[in-house]
Amino acid sequence: MRPVVSNDGWMHAESDILTLHHYEQDGKKLYSFYDNFEKLVKGASGNPQYQPFAQGYAYRGQPIIMSEFGGTAYVRDEGSGWGYGNGVKSDEEFLERFGGLIEAVQKMSISGYCYTQLTDVEQEVNGLLRADRTAKIAPEKIAEHNR
């Protein structure tokens, strides 16, 4: 049987996996939203945008995945474009922010995570790769933060 997600990221009803989305760009702030299990399953800071379950539904022991986070705009090569937060303009600045975000989700009581996003798409310059699939940053440097 394959697990089914009822509504990726928020306001789940019946769902086999609890998925969360959060685009805070500061790793310490991101962690503060979900620094204990209760916050993960009840919602972050009372903000309806981050409520994991629709009214009348609650956590039933499902695995928890941060299925979208990050989305940092890296505008060094592209000049301009859209992404979450203030864009970064250097490898060092990107890796510092990326590292903080990865550290935050790795400390959470979750089963997994998926960084947003793999490639740039149209006006979105928040990919780890450019739209032509070439690396913005050496993949080895990205991998260092995921160990």
Where are these regions (language model features)?
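Short, well-ordered secondary-structure micro-motifs within conserved domains or adaptor modules
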Residues: H12-S32
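Substrate-binding clefts and catalytic carboxylate motifs of secreted carbohydrate-active enzymes
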Residues: D26-G27, Y31-R147
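Conserved residues at the C-terminal ends of beta-strands
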Residues: N7, H21, T116
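Histidine- and/or cysteine-centered catalytic micro-motif in compact active-site loops
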Residues: G9, Y23, F69
